[in-house]
Structure formats: structure tokens, C-alpha cells
Curated annotation (Swiss-Prot):
Catalyzed reactions per annotation: an N-(acyl)-sphingosylphosphocholine = an N-(acyl)-sphingosyl-1,3-cyclic phosphate + choline; an N-(acyl)-sphingosylphosphoethanolamine = an N-(acyl)-sphingosyl-1,3-cyclic phosphate + ethanolamine; a 1-acyl-sn-glycero-3-phosphocholine = a 1-acyl-sn-glycero-2,3-cyclic phosphate + choline; a 1-acyl-sn-glycero-3-phosphoethanolamine = a 1-acyl-sn-glycero-2,3-cyclic phosphate + ethanolamine
Keyword entries, A-Z: Cytolysis, Dermonecrotic toxin, Disulfide bond, Hemolysis, Lipid degradation, Lipid metabolism, Lyase, Magnesium, Metal-binding, Secreted, Toxin
Protein location: Secreted
Protein name: Dermonecrotic toxin SpeSicTox-betaIIA3ii
Organism: Sicarius peruensis (Six-eyed sand spider)
Coiled-coil residue spans: none
Length: 275
């Protein structure tokens, strides 16, 4: 999975897909009451990126629904995953539940269309800190109360704050979640980052019987050398400001017979087992 990073303006969606991304990450900005208002990162953001691009959240969902609905004139078959970078750290953790209700409701109304020809892409809920776990509970509660639990099959969870992996597992256990999980490891492209925690996540992923990390991605990679380093370690995904650079690296002899781009037929919640 090549995840285009910080794809917050509507016009950027096709731009990043044209560069080779098959997944997009966008920031969800909330007001003080936990209402999702905009796809907006705010300042500061990654080096070399414009931090001010944004869209109204519901309008953005309307657009990516069209891009991921077969038969729609805007349909792009390559876009198979949306990663929602939920900016919950900007609001009180007491509002995390309200935020979960709001995001689930807006996805039902503007993306899934409550079953009426909605978008087909998978949804990854990127939560910054384990203290905001009530967002997940609220999201699932809302799907159940609205009679649309079928969409749980399309939804995954990812804690992105580089917290202790065992602490993350404990929170997932508390929530009763042991599937549809990704584990991210990374830092803004402005700073270097070692591989110690990334290696630990991959080790857990590859431990037989361990259910809490079936997929791992590294972020935000901009240098080809760091992309190669992550691929050699065996990550499932790379988040980058430059999807075209990831595509070039994947075409190199070292990687071309080991990796391919994920398609809609690939389940993003299953641990990959080489044939």
C-alpha cells in the first residue's frame, strides 16, 4: 500500500493517484465539541508541504465516494484505502466519544450512503493516542445503533503516536478488538527516525498466533534510501509525500519480485503469507 500523505484538498486526490498512490491519508480537524469540520492539517506540517490546503469534511467524503464507486465517471479503481488522520489531540479526550459518533455518522451519510451505492474503499481510523480509545467505541456503537454493522468489515484501527506496543495491545484488548488492525511507526519528514520500534512491530506481526498487528506501515518517507530500508525490513505499506518515488523504488531489481501494489482484491486486514 502506497499511502499519499496529507491529501487534504479535493484536487489533490487525483493528483496523488496520478503519482502512483493506491491509498490516501487525510487529516480530520474537529471543533471543540468533537464535530469533524475540515480535512486540514494546520501549521506546522511536513517540510516542503503547504500546510493550509483543506476541504469541508463532508464535501471531501462526497468526492472520494465518487472516486471509489464503480460506474461513477470519477471512479479510479486504484484507490482502495482511506486513512483518516483523526486530530483528536486538539480536543479534550472527554470529547473523543462525541467525535466517534460524528465521524461514523458522516461516513454513513456521505461515503457509504447507508447502503445506496456508496464508496467501496477500506477505511483506516488513525488515532493519535491510546487515551482517545473512546472514539473507537463510539464509532462501533454508532454503526450498531444505525443498523449498519456491515461496515465494520470495511473499517480498521491504527494508533499512530508511537506509543508502547504492549500498551496499545492492552487498550485493544479492553475494547475487544483483535482484528482489522494496522500499526504505524514514523515521524514527520523533517526529522530522521531509527528503526527500533518499527522492527519490534514487525517482529510482533510475524509472531505466530499474535493477532494485534497483522499490518505495519512506515511514515512519512521522502528519501529513497529510507524507503529501501523500510522495504528491506518487510513493511506492508509506505506513507509518503512522493508516491512516484515509492513506485520507482518498487521497480528496482531488489524489490520488483518481492512486492506489488495492493489492489481492491487484497484484504488490508489479513496478515500477508508468502506463497
Amino acid at each position: 500500500w502506497i499511502m499519499g500523505h496529507m491529501v487534504n484538498a479535493i484536487e489533490q486526490v487525483d493528483e496523488f493517484l496520478d503519482l502512483g498512490a493506491n491509498a490516501i491519508e487525510f487529516d480530520v480537524d474537529f471543533d471543540d465539541d468533537g464535530v469533524a469540520k475540515y480535512t486540514h492539517h494546520r501549521i506546522p506540517c511536513d517540510c516542503g508541504r503547504l500546510c493550509t490546503k483543506y476541504a469541508v469534511f463532508t464535501e471531501y467524503l462526497d468526492y472520494v465516494r465518487q472516486v471509489t464507486t464503480p460506474g461513477d465517471p470519477k471512479f479510479r479503481k486504484e484507490l482502495v484505502l482511506h486513512a483518516l488522520d483523526l486530530k483528536l489531540q486538539r480536543i479534550s479526550s472527554e470529547k473523543a466519544y462525541a467525535a466517534g459518533v460524528d465521524v461514523a455518522t458522516k461516513l454513513l451519510d456521505h461515503y457509504w450512503m447507508r447502503g445506496w451505492n456508496g464508496g467501496r474503499a477500506y477505511i483506516l481510523l488513525n488515532i493519535p493516542l491510546v487515551e482517545d480509545y473512546e472514539f473507537i467505541r463510539a464509532f462501533k456503537d454508532t454503526l450498531r445503533k444505525e443498523g449498519h454493522e456491515q461496515y465494520n468489515a470495511k473499517v480498521g484501527i491504527n494508533f499512530t503516536g508511537n506509543e508502547d506496543l504492549d500498551e496499545i495491545r492492552e487498550v485493544l484488548e479492553k475494547l475487544g478488538e483483535d482484528e482489522h488492525i494496522w500499526q504505524a511507526d514514523g515521524i514527520t519528514s523533517c526529522f530522521p527516525r531509527g528503526t527500533e520500534r518499527l522492527k519490534k512491530a514487525l517482529e510482533k506481526r510475524d509472531t505466530p498466533g499474535y493477532k494485534y498487528i497483522p499490518k505495519v506501515y512506515a511514515w512519512t518517507l521522502v528519501r529513497s534510501s529510507i524507503m529501501r530500508r523500510s522495504l528491506r525490513l518487510g513493511v506492508d505499506g509506505v506513507m509518503s509525500n512522493y508516491p512516484d518515488s515509492v513506485v520507482k523504488v518498487l521497480k528496482e531489481k531488489e524489490f520488483s519480485d518481492k512486492f506489488r501494489l495492493a489492489t481492491y482484491a487484497d484484504n488490508p486486514w489479513e496478515k500477508f503469507t508468502p506463497i
